[in-house]
Design a protein with these regions (language model features):
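Phosphate/pyrophosphate-binding loops at sites that engage ATP/ADP/AMP, CoA/4′-phosphopantetheine
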Residues: 61-73, 151-152, 260-270
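Glycine-rich phosphate-binding/hydrolytic loop that grips phosphoryl groups
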Residues: 298-328
Length: 328
């Protein structure tokens, strides 16, 4: 797995806008300069799930403090625009060019001196023809495309993988999102790893047991389906094929292995590296699963992708010099 260098570093210069990544559990704000680099960062644990509808503005105001000035527009991405967030913002229908997100920002009515916008999520169909949605990942995808353009790779059409609680697999052609599919991979593994009989009484570790993980990935590629393969964690342990400290990473390999192979079996085989956007640790697991299928991958940190995406949205607003009406 090739790892990209960070796309933004702490920098000086004149502040230009504020980028906000507001997820279910955390809130991060970045003061950005005119070149799109970070001047300062402020973090909070006041994610969407911890707030009532009337609390969002107050929480943001407290966090930003002296950043609250009329000449610094605020661009927010993530679950802040979901049902249960600050304001539910309608999904945009795919196919859609990611640069067109800047034309569909939802401008909030607030008592803050800054203009405040939420980036809309996307709605499409997955590989099974079923409805699918994303919110927050669209901004990361825009950031990834911006990076590819900077590297003179705009003509490439990689498959994008955004692992997490719900993993997104995205197809983009010439900057246009054509289709994406969501897997409940992370949430499923969390339940199995915390509550299931498969791991009861077994040790936990923060370190990846790569050999055990690879065994799980290989099991996922056999006949029988995921339900059968999951139980094999128990049977292989009690029969001595797995050690106690193998089981959790074996389960992770089964779940991630199925995510990778099940989705990719419905798509054309990638001819360029799969672009993984996420945390380094989780992305490394996906890279291992991809390599078992003789596929290469590249890694871009989710935080870096979000910042770059919001920077691109902000720059397009400045170029157009037009801010839509509030509440639109």
């Amino acid at each position: 797995m090739t790892q990209f260098n960070p796309v933004s570093q702490p920098a000086g210069g004149q502040a230009s806008f504020i980028a906000v990544d507001w997820g279910t559990t955390n809130l991060r704000a970045f003061l950005m300069n005119q070149d799109g680099h970070i001047q300062a960062q402020r973090d909070s644990d006041r994610g969407m799930l911890k707030l009532g509808a009337a609390e969002f503005e107050h929480v943001l105001s407290d966090l930003l403090g002296d950043w609250l000035t009329p000449d610094l527009p605020i661009y927010m991405a993530g679950m802040v625009g979901s049902r249960g967030g600050w304001q539910e913002v309608p999904y945009l229908h795919c196919p859609i060019h990611l640069d067109d997100l800047s034309e569909h920002l939802f401008w909030l009515t607030t008592s803050l001196p800054n203009k405040v916008a939420i980036v809309p999520g996307l709605r499409s169909t997955g590989v099974a023809g079923l409805l699918d949605v994303m919110r927050g990942e669209e901004t990361q995808l825009l950031g990834a495309l911006d990076w590819l353009e900077e590297q003179d790779r705009a003509a490439e059409s990689p498959i994008f993988c955004l692992p997490g609680t719900h993993c997104k697999w995205v197809q983009i052609k010439q900057g246009e999102v054509t289709q994406f599919s969501t897997s409940i991979t992370g949430e499923l593994f969390a339940r199995l790893n915390d509550e299931s009989s498969l791991v009861k009484g077994l040790p936990k570790s923060d370190q990846l047991n790569e050999a055990a993980f690879q065994k799980g990935v290989l099991a996922s590629q056999q006949a029988g389906g995921i339900l059968h393969h999951l139980f094999s964690a128990r049977s292989r342990f009690v029969c001595g094929e797995l050690m106690a400290d193998d089981v959790r990473d074996y389960l992770s390999g089964v779940v991630i292995g199925h995510d990778v192979s099940d989705v990719l079996s419905s798509l054309e085989r990638p001819t360029v590296p799969v672009l993984i956007i996420g945390s380094e640790a989780l992305s490394a697991r996906y890279a291992l699963a991809l390599s078992s299928l003789n596929l290469t991958s590249e890694f871009l940190a989710a935080n870096e992708a979000s910042i770059r995406g919001l920077k691109r949205l902000a720059s397009r607003q400045v170029k157009s010099a037009v801010y839509p009406a509030i509440g639109a």
